[in-house]
Amino acid sequence: MRDYIPKYLNAFLLAFATFAVGFAIFIAKDSNSSSHLYFSTSSSLWTSSFSPAFITVSIFLTVHRFREKRKRNGSNPGSGYWKRDGKVEAELATARVLIREAQLNYSSTTSSPLGDEDYVPHGDIYRNPYAFHRSYLLMEKMFKIYVYEEGDPPIFHYGLCKDIYSMEGLFLNFMENDVLKYRTRDPDKAHVYFLPFSVVMILHHLFDPVVRDKAVLERVIADYVQIISKKYPYWNTSDGFDHFMLSCHDWGHRATWYVKKLFFNSIRVLCNANISEYFNPEKDAPFPEINLLTGDINNLTGGLDPISRTTLAFFAGKSHGKIRPVLLNHWKEKDKDILVYENLPDGLDYTEMMRKSRFCICPSGHEVASPRVPEAIYSGCVPVLISENYVLPFSDVLNWEKFSVSVSVKEIPELKRILMDIPEERYMRLYEGVKKVKRHILVNDPPKRYDVFNMIIHSIWLRRLNVKLL
């Protein structure tokens, strides 16, 4: 930080930050709700302990960092750089004010007062339904995404729309065909810029499984960023802060490492949202891993009513990673209520088992994300999350505690007791929460308002609101 801030500002910033912390603590203690402190993450917009002071400090330091970096590089944001359309930043500034106003005026006893012919967010599955609704409507009204046209399929502008990486392919194809309605052909009017490469397709077509040279990612992605940064002014103007990439591949985070500004500055939208692998929820956005085996999106949802669900908990899956071996060691085919299998026995159907279970166990494998989480929600089965360092999808908006159960690795031996001890009243609230949240995890073609694809866009929108560019 000292490299970016002149010495004469250190004392001022220290005093200002101290005041901000004190102010936030006062506000938090005075609140009837949680006393947690939230810095400039997107989740701060939805929590009642929100402190505008922290946002102000963060924005000031971010803008100051841009200015100082350019001065040291012999350039000036007002000279030799493309001048950003003032309307773009003015729109974002207006959105910030309106969203904060909605957050501060929120009452837990009311839903959003805003009109909406399709859906009005309400209930405790949201951190703040009013602020979310206000933000979503503003996004629909003003958010514009520019998709760089450079690059050819199948590496760029294209992705596979089936199997475990289907979400990456579907998003690329929807953006390419402007199905989501946020794309602009005028880059000067854009709020964010999309780098339309597919990590899955790079590895599928260019990666040699024998040689296993991961440098192919570096060559493709670094070359692409170099091309667009020379042809257009937008990357250099913002240092990549208003650019984003999206990947559901396990190596999605690795793919960004080879371009440091992409790794540290840009919005990385990843299924594998692992904090231990430098996923930064202040700027990066998690989204769900959904396994569309054949690409068919019909009949994804279903399930019995709570009274007819005869199985307490269910899991079937291979033993890999650090968590699953622990689960299988303790529970594999050892209990009539906790049904855990490494290989599903003949005569049992995976989907039907989820649809008749009260709880679906969702342990991380090699990577933190698991397609079992959306599968459980589709089945009306309360997810039991067993993971470490995993940032849950859309957790800046959704309150996962209201429709899932979290169990730590050390609590795996006590899994049955934990689930049996959940009162029926609480289980019913969790079950109803799963039914409500399904709308936001569901895959639709074409996409529908508030579905998983629009929620991904909303996550990107929130990250863009966290950055102020001059």
From Swiss-Prot:
The keyword Transmembrane applies. Keywords: Cell wall biogenesis/degradation, Glycoprotein, Glycosyltransferase, Golgi apparatus, Membrane, Signal-anchor, Transferase, Transmembrane, Transmembrane helix. It comes from the Eukaryota. Pfam families: Exostosin_GT47 (PF03016). The chain crosses the membrane at residues 8-28. Residues 1-7 are cytoplasmic. The keyword Plastid does not apply. GO terms for molecular function: glycosyltransferase activity. Its main location: Golgi. It is found in: Golgi apparatus membrane. GO terms for cellular component: Golgi membrane. Residues 29-470 are lumenal. InterPro entries: Exostosin, Exostosin_GT47. Glycans are attached at N32, N73, N105, N236, N274, N299. It is a single-pass type II membrane protein. It is an enzyme of class 2 (transferase). GO terms for biological process: cell wall organization; protein glycosylation. Its EC number is 2.4.-.-. May be involved in cell wall biosynthesis. Belongs to the glycosyltransferase 47 family. This is Probable glycosyltransferase At3g07620. It comes from Arabidopsis thaliana (Mouse-ear cress).
